[in-house]
């Protein structure tokens, strides 16, 4: 299956004693239902290596009747984790998305890096929805780490750029 990728980076505000990349990732992993723009349900209330989860309402109410999107956490580190999609997920099995936080230029950043089947035309529509979901995830993280007011205008401009799929898609 030909695989393509997308990547989004969001400025989540100024680094401070309470807002660091490691602390931001710890919050995402400990409180996924406060940070993700959809419900994370399953084996644990926190993100844990090897645990399966169902993502609910990822593409609309009741996932537009398609059922939950099952995933498994396949990698975890202090500053990142990766989901792999399982059979029954709207993107199909075997896709990945990695969430990573880092510090650059005195700011905390959130990156979402995902793969998808480039031969399935629905995936491009899903990417548009994902862009909006990941923008909301970044906002929720800013709220959680207390940096909502410190993210600059470039963040909004980056969100608009992210809606232009050719900017962030890498087909190979």
Could you say what each language-model-derived stretch is?
Residues 60-65, 88-93, 118-124:
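Short, cysteine-centered beta-strand-loop-beta hairpins and adjacent loop/turn segments enriched
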Residues 84-87, 110-114:
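Catalytic Cys-His active-site segments of thiol-dependent hydrolases/isopeptidases
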Residues 13-16, 102-104, 115-117:
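Solvent-exposed residues in well-ordered beta-strands and their adjoining turns
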Residues 65-104:
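Hydrophobic-ligand binding "helix-grip"
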Residues 1-64:
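Hydrophobic ligand-binding cavity/cleft-lining segments
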Residues 3-9, 80, 96, 107-109:
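Intrinsic-disorder/low-complexity, polar/charged segments enriched in Ser/Thr/Lys/Arg/Asp/Glu/Gln
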Residues 109, 115-171:
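A conserved amphipathic terminal alpha-helix motif
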């Amino acid at each position: 299956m030909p695989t393509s990728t997308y990547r989004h980076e969001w400025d989540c505000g100024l680094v401070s004693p309470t807002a660091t990349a490691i602390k931001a990732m710890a919050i995402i992993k400990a409180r996924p239902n406060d940070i993700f723009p959809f419900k994370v349900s399953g084996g644990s209330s926190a993100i844990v290596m090897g645990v399966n989860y169902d993502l609910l309402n990822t593409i609309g109410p009741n996932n537009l009747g398609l059922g939950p999107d099952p995933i498994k956490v396949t990698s975890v580190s202090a500053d990142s984790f990766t989901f792999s999609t399982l059979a029954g997920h709207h993107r199909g099995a075997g896709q990945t998305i990695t969430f990573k936080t880092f510090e650059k230029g005195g700011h905390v950043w959130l990156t979402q890096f995902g793969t998808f089947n480039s031969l399935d035309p629905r995936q491009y529509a899903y990417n548009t929805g994902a862009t909006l979901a990941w923008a909301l995830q970044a906002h929720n993280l800013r709220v959680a780490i207390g940096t909502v007011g410190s993210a600059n205008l470039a963040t909004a401009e980056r969100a608009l750029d992210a809606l232009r799929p050719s900017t962030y898609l890498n087909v190979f």
